[in-house]
């Protein structure tokens, strides 16, 4: 993959669209979720056999869920719970954790989702080390709108200290992104 530096969003999009395997995974560089956690994801994609409950899996998208967010500061936890409430109210996304940077996709799902991105796409790249909450929201909203099967899997996650968190700025950006995805949906831009 040869790309000029275009920030986290641009790098993930380019990598996902050029992925060659049957599945594509993106994860945060700090490895707060260890790569070994992907072992929990793979059975979710399988259409053979079934789970312990006897149901076939066959998911198109598998996302990580940081249950309890052990080690995260209280401010981060409060921000997460507020965001969960607004997310379910505005976008009706039923997932516990949309923001964990550990997500995997079946190959055919990648192109269907990533070619429909409107806020974060090839022509609207946000530069810098991180992207706002809208990146993951838009991906999951599109996947759900397309009727793709999405599984959420509890993973081991370790809080990594960062100075990049600004509770007020990040909360306002998150709300802005929620509204942008909702407006795009109302305008029919995710068809």
Describe the predicted segments one by one.
Residues 1-3, 49, 141-147:
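Long hydrophobic alpha-helices with heptad-repeat/coiled-coil character
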Residues 40, 116, 123-191:
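Hydrophobic helical membrane-anchoring modules
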Residues 31-33:
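Acidic metal-phosphate-binding loop of nucleotide-sugar-dependent transferases
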Residues 3-6, 10-18, 23, 35-129, ...:
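Acceptor/aglycone-binding surface of glycosyltransferases and processive sugar-polymer synthases
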